[in-house]
């Protein structure tokens, strides 16, 4: 069963939810069984460039802290922000899209995750909202609303 999913793309943690059969919103547990996913990414240099997102990224941060990124949302809409990993520069939109892809995968147990509404802080200006929509599109999502 498909439908519209809600995503909280948070600074520290993120989550995906969907309305159940009686119209009540329910958070969908991630692949690790948790209801929230750390908004973290780690580029593993020991496993051929594997990108870890969420709990796996948090667990990897002690091995290569310089290759782990958190609090990406603070940089949404900032065209000057970039993280250099092995000579490749990653901007906030690209990094946020990785978190959204993880949420999309985790939400798939409730049906195809395509149409989403993403929540952002009230203080987000139009540039930050647009960057969030771009990250959603990059993750293969149809962002029908930003709230």
Ranges and model annotations:
Residues 1-38, 43-147:
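N-terminal phosphate-binding loop and flanking beta/alpha elements of the actin-like ATPase fold
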């Amino acid at each position: 069963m498909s439908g519209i999913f809600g995503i909280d793309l948070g600074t520290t943690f993120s989550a995906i939810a969907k309305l159940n059969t009686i119209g009540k919103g329910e958070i969908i547990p991630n692949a690790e069984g948790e209801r929230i996913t750390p908004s973290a990414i780690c580029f593993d240099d020991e496993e051929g460039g594997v990108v870890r997102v969420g709990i796996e990224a948090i667990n990897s941060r002690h091995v290569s802290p310089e290759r782990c990124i958190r609090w990406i949302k603070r940089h949404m809409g900032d065209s000057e922000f970039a993280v250099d990993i092995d000579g490749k520069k990653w901007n906030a939109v690209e990094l946020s899209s990785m978190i959204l892809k993880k949420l999309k995968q985790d939400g798939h147990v409730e049906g195809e995750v395509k149409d989403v509404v993403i929540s952002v802080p009230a203080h987000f200006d139009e540039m930050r909202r647009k960057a969030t929509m771009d990250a959603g599109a990059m993750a293969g999502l149809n962002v029908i609303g930003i709230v």
